[in-house]
Amino acid sequence: SGLEVDELNSMPGVRSARWAGPECDDAANNALLLAQLAGVPPERRGARFVCALALALPGGGRRLWRGEMPGRIAEEERGDGGFGYDPLFLPDGRTCTSAELTAAQKDAISHRGKAVRAFVAWLKEQ
């Protein structure tokens, strides 16, 4: 899973958890992202969370499920819930950040929730 920011050429991507360095924390990652987007107008702050869920099958087969949560990066942190970039991420169609959503609201639209639901649907068919 990772956060892709349009203005940063889809970075930090898979490096999201360590964007500010190998020993960084969520606060450092969020501070760096805000600094990198300083002065960037809202219409150019598009972003998405992406989750890729892969399964290696016996005999060499493999399956991949992908989930995305599109949105944009806010200009300041808001909310106490969630983790990581949630206080900065405004999901499409929402006026609140991911950190301001309940766990159930976030799961219904999240990239991880979408990927896992697709996997479970496939698993039930097997």
At which residue positions do the language-model features occur?
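Anionic-ligand binding patches
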Residues: S1-Q126
